[in-house]
Amino acid sequence: MITNPPVKINLGLNVLRKRSDGYHDLDTLFIPSHQITDTLEIISGDDYSRTSAGLNSIYGGNSRIGNDRLSEDEEIPTFSQAISEDGKLMITVARKEGVDWPVLKDLCAKAYLLLNEDYNLPSVKIFLEKTSPVGAGLGGGSADAAYTLKMLSEMFGLGLDNAKLAEYASRLGSD
C-alpha cells in the first residue's frame, strides 16, 4: 500500500494560553498542500532484503515512483534503515539531505509500535521518502504518522474510525 501524505500550510496561527499538559491552545487556519508530500509505503511481511519496501523499484533502476527518471545531476537520497528489537518492523527513511535522526524514533515507526501494543500486528516494512522540509512547521511528520495509522488499520482490518485514529495520533505527540 502506497500513499502521499500532504503537508499543511498555515494561513493564520495564533498561539493562545499554555495548558497544564505543556501544550498550547491554538487558533489556526490551514490548508493541506498536495504539491508538497512525502511518499509512504507499507508492505506486510518480514523479508527484510534491501529490495523490500520499494527500494529496488524506486531507486534500484535509477527511477522514481511514477516512473519519472532521475536527471543526471539529481542526487539519490541517503537511506537510513533499522529493524525493531522484536523483528516485526523494518523502517527505511530516505532523504536527499541525509537522515539525521534515529529511524526507529520516526513517527511512522512509533505509530506502528503503538498499534502493535494493542493489536499484535503482523510484521511490516515501512518505506518513507521525506521530500517535505523537516522542522519547517508544515506538519510533515504528523501527516506521515496519521497516514501510517490509517494504512495499518485498513491493511489489517482493525476497523479504527476517525475518532480512534485521532486518539492514537494524540498519543504520538504533536508538532
Where does each model-flagged region fall?
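ATP-binding N-lobe of GHMP and related small-molecule kinases
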Residues: M1-A136, E154, L158-A163
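Ubiquitous "structural anchor" signal
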Residues: R69, A145-L149, L165
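Short, small-residue alpha-helix embedded
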Residues: S142-F156
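Alpha/beta catalytic cores of group-transfer enzymes, especially the acyltransferase/condensing modules
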Residues: L158-D175
